[in-house]
Amino acid sequence: MPGEAPVEDYDPKEIEPKWRERWLEERKYRFEGGEDRPAFVIDTPPPYPTGELHMGHVLNWTYMDVVARYKRMCGYDVFFPQGWDCHGLPTEVKVEEIHGITKRDAPRREFRKLCEELTLENIRKMREQLIQLGCSIDWWTDCIDYENEELKELGSYVTMDPDYIRRSQYGFLELLEKGYAYREEHPVNWCPRCETAIAFAEVEYVTRETYLNYIEFPVADGDGSVTIATTRPELLPACVAVAVHPDDDRYSDLVGKKLVVPLHERFGDRDTPWEVPVIADEEVDPEFGTGIVMICTFGDKQDVAWVKRHDLPIVRAIDEQGKMTEVAGEFAGMEVEEARAAIVEALKEEGYLVKREKITQNVGVCWRCKTPIEILVKEQWFVKVRELAEDVKEAARKMVWIPEHMRKRLEDWTESMDWDWCISRQRIFATPIPVWYCKECGEVIPAEKDQLPVDPTRDDPPVDECPKCGCSEFEPETDVMDTWMDSSITPLVITGWPDEEPDLPVDLRPQGHDIIRTWLYYTTVRALVHADTEPFKEILINGMVFGEDGYKMSKSRGNVVEPTEVIEEYGADALRYWAVSSGAPGSDVQYMTKTIKRGYRFAKKIWNVCRLAKDHIDDAPSVEEVEGDLTPADRWILSKFHRLVDEVTEHLESGYRFNDAIKAIEEFAWEELADDYLEMAKLRLYRPEELGEGSREAARAVLRHVLDGLLRLLAPFMPFVTEELYYRLFDESVHDQAWPEASEKWIDEGVEEVGEILREIVTEVRKAKTDAGLRMGAEFEGLTVHVQDEELAESLEKAIPDLKSATRAKEVEVEVGEPKLERVPVKVEPRMDVIGPKYRELTRDIIEYVENNPDEVASAIKEDGKAKLEIDGEKVVLDEECVDVEWELRVKGGEGKAVEIRPGVVVEIRGLST
């Protein structure tokens, strides 16, 4: 295969599997870790193992793979690891669905084993898909000491392996030691479907229609009532106060009084009275509803703030399954939506419901299952992130953000946090929280670091008796950690922590903008706590992917396109082309089949160029060796190529502007190299006996030089086709080559100006051939280029072989001086549809006259706007509507078509005929 000419047709189905297999066999992209090259470390996102890559993955991994391949070519020893973020609720839900069970139906250990088996199967599928995409991942360098050999082959780390669990638990213990982790009873976001606490960063907000219910609250110990508007009447059993704005004159007399909670007779018993105080608070919005609000435990974050600020009691009206508790009386046991409807009906029956208004509101939902969240008071584990807010913002300023404006998302999120990070979850498939509790006094007994990993539900605590009270009985922690506790230590783990000092910041974090407030935020917190530094030097952000219909891809909309199907039809290079060309980093992009097809056509174009060039560039000399024989076209393409190297390098070095880089490469390869230069060089390559051996050698040298560099520039973006072609042309791997360097020696604006004139001349000849109905390769008599500038004339004289080759003119001349131009009619056609109705019986004679005297008629129309004739004694006037005249510019006295392509440059084309 090496050294062979590319076969006739480009077929990615033949090329890509071969190189995927070979790269794996050679362990081509393994990180060496030596002293001879600087390291470049990527903190690759560990995807959740769903079993299928989606187009968002394709976008993200293509971005990071382009960086990895580019940096290797720039001389870096690139560490491009791949981990897997295994734990989490979606796997538990899928296991329940597959096996027809719930987590309560199986022993804890067996349920976890089912989750691990499914995860292992999914990782294997996704690993193959990443390989299929052409990602130059290091599958051979382990970041953890695998205990499970079955997991070892799947990536650099797998978070469900015992050693990763050890590292995650180590981090928890360090947070506890440093005073950042704590446990307390506190309101938390709770998902009734998942039956677990979730962090604020895991709450999404969606717009939904609901009703604003206006409810009468009687005034206690007096006459009258006030109307309060609420969207959550089901929380009436948990109403502990009502609030007004202190400057709202409508309710100034109410402050200090009490109101009676409607329907309280139908609710259950509670420790706090059903007469609730009216308080004043500046955070009440006088414009919402009636300007008076009920404070319930808890409707939203604002309720939590008011309860804390005014030391109000807490009533638990909703349980962990999202059902009403006993305090709701006859409504107990109902799910929230059912209770809402029933209580509204009861309010209507009792005469408390004044009216209802349909409104839209933002509702917080679980980001996994989209169930509306509740705020419940639970004892949970937290990490103190609020006190690190300024440190996080300072760290964010030290990191380079691509694009820069994405930093504000992190800063805005940091400033918006009211609560600490809740890290405990009431699930099974996750890292166990490594603590026990004294059965007598509740003292927290953390594991020792040297006994990690531990599962408190199976393992014994590190002490025989409680250090506080002496009790010898302990209860295990059954909660597990938030999965972000696992993934937020990835830059630490890939640099050896906690067994070695972590080498932070790593060079690059590539990720989506949708997880800035989670993965990126939490990772920054952990790096600050565990390593006292920011985690990354650069952050490369990718956007979301939308379907061809303009909507976010989703199975419910039916607009999902599977990456594997695209690869099977068009190849991975075409899919990667879509990823890099569709938009700038950080921007949302649209999947477009036409872009995939363009990528395929571009690969095919490069293939065909190399196929044509193969026989001519073997053993070609260097451009320096043939410098004296270089034509203006040679120098033009060399200048354009070296300018391209500068441009593409700048795009990649200044913000990873992949879309600008691939656009520049494509325009050069397709338009300047393939469409123009090759046409200018073909005759020199194929007919050295006519144009000289030196001219042929120059063309061979230039073609080799440019193709060598072009394949290198394209290699990070389209690694398969470039590898195949580079091996066929140069018998080496393109991915082992250095990144091209631009040489100022070859960049010359004057040369480029001459080259553009050559292109314009060729374009005009092609147009003329098209108009004449000739094929592009047809030979014709000749062309003369008239120029006024002697220096330009000298350059064009040297370009005669280029022009002959590109135009197929038998003779090419260059003349200095300003030619005299004239417009001559080349087609004069009388219009019977206009002349007939106007002149009737004279029509035949008029047409005959025009056909016999075309120049006379055309000249008259040109000069006077009309031709005056006398036919059979009658006056006839023909204007532009009566006669179609097609003019052609010519050099006076010449026979060929002339075109003024720019001031001072006229091309005369002779002898074009069908």
Curated annotation (Swiss-Prot):
It holds the Pfam family Anticodon_1. Keywords: Aminoacyl-tRNA synthetase, ATP-binding, Cytoplasm, Ligase, Nucleotide-binding, Protein biosynthesis. A motif ('HIGH' region) lies at residues 47-57. Its main location: cytoplasm. GO terms for biological process: valyl-tRNA aminoacylation. It is found in: Cytoplasm. Its EC number is 6.1.1.9. It is an enzyme of class 6 (ligase). GO terms for cellular component: cytosol. A motif ('KMSKS' region) lies at residues 552-556. It catalyses: tRNA(Val) + L-valine + ATP = L-valyl-tRNA(Val) + AMP + diphosphate. One of its GO terms (molecular function) is ATP binding. CDD domains: Anticodon_Ia_Val (cd07962), ValRS_core (cd00817). The keyword NAD does not apply. The keyword Iron does not apply. ATP binds at K555. Belongs to the class-I aminoacyl-tRNA synthetase family. ValS type 2 subfamily. ValRS has two distinct active sites: one for aminoacylation and one for editing. The misactivated threonine is translocated from the active site to the editing site. HAMAP family: Val_tRNA_synth_type2 (MF_02005). Catalyzes the attachment of valine to tRNA(Val). As ValRS can inadvertently accommodate and process structurally similar amino acids such as threonine, to avoid such errors, it has a 'posttransfer' editing activity that hydrolyzes mischarged Thr-tRNA(Val) in a tRNA-dependent manner. This is Valine--tRNA ligase. It comes from Methanopyrus kandleri (strain AV19 / DSM 6324 / JCM 9639 / NBRC 100938).
